[in-house]
Amino acid sequence: MLLILDSNEYIFGFGAFKKPACEMLLDIISDTFPIHSIRIPRLIAEEVGRHLTPEEFREFIGFITNLTTIDEDFVVPFELGVQYELKGLKPADAFIAAYVEWTGADALVTENRHFLTKHSNLPFKIINAKDCLSLIKSTSR
């Protein structure tokens, strides 16, 4: 299962104010790679960097480099982002949605972009860390 984790998943997994579900999700992804894998765009990596201490950011980068590489934002087709903007999404949200679609990911895991669920016919799921953990457990049986 290919997942895109929003910046808040990493911030709550590596930062000072941890959420247990986010920490557990990062651990499970690491333990079950490549069955469960991730992709990350530069935009999310930079956002994470703005919210972590240098030490926490080094840990985050180590996690990322063990599992994937950071995709440059310009590789996502501009037209795909425009399609999401035309649906009413703000530019950063449109980019994230376009990135998830472009990668062919199964889900965007986020704690705060659930407004995307109001848009019908998205080619991916939008779930939080807790629901993603449940999904992983149910598909591992």
Q: Which sequence ranges carry the predicted segments?
A:
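A short acidic, often aromatic-flanked loop/helix-cap motif at beta-alpha or helix-coil junctions
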Residues: 46-47, 73-81, 131-137
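Active-site neighborhoods of divalent-metal-dependent phosphate/nucleic-acid chemistry enzymes
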Residues: 70-113, 117
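Acidic, PIN/NYN-like endoribonuclease modules and their adjacent C-terminal/linker elements
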Residues: 106, 113-141
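Short catalytic/ligand-binding loop motif for oxyanion handling, primarily in non-cytosolic enzymes
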Residues: 12-13, 47-49, 116-118
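Short, surface-exposed acidic-centric catalytic microdomains
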Residues: 37-72
